[in-house]
Amino acid sequence: MKRSSKADALLEALPYFQQFRGRTVVVHGGGKAITAAMRQENLTARFVDGHRVTDQASIKIIDRILTEVISPSLAAKIQELGGQAQVLSGKDVLVAVKAPPRLDVTGAKIDLGFVGDITSTDITQVQKLVDAEIVPIISPLGRGRDGQVYNINADIAAAKIAQALKAHKIIYLSDVNGVRRDPRDETSLISTLTPDQIQQLKQEGVIASGMIPKVDSALEALAGGVAKVHFLDGKQAHSLLLELFTDAGIGTEIAATK
């Protein structure tokens, strides 16, 4: 699999995390690769509030791409660089139920299909790997009590796992440079925000569409004990290093209210 710039940003930063005894868990998505695989099967990707509408054919493709392509590729590259990593399917970590319908832009209720809401987590294996200084590579898949596999929004999955692990920080790598006052203007980046300010921006419509699951999961993580959340542009060279090891940073940081 051709690596993305987001993967490059992660991989170059891992040795520095390990040098400073930082313990890292990777929860990844696979949006573009999944959409490309769906297109090969003549399936059209559709999103509602940042969630991919997932029918029976789609969930099989999503499971295959995440489990057989993206997770192993990330783990292999970490090992090539001298680190230790192990793939863990989200199906063995996240317990989920079918998500309720969402409203589209017209106000119509849309059945999301096999999209799941997380009801609980089992981090036993994740914690063992973290304690052994092995990087867990986790796919955003959940499993129902009946065995049904669900597609989980990766941002939400990361937040739930971070809360369960009592992580200090979550870093989201996306295709934008952070939260912007004007979503179309990358120079309108907001460097620091509080949870209250995030809620205000949502009410004003500044935060909308695909950013909603990201900021909602961030707020939930902060409320659940995570101290800080960072939003970075994974396409920017050295984005993780610049955010974490420079005074100014390059993305948006949201800190829990003390």
Where are these regions (language model features)?
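Nucleotide/pyrophosphate-binding catalytic subdomain
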Residues: 1-235, 242, 248, 255-258
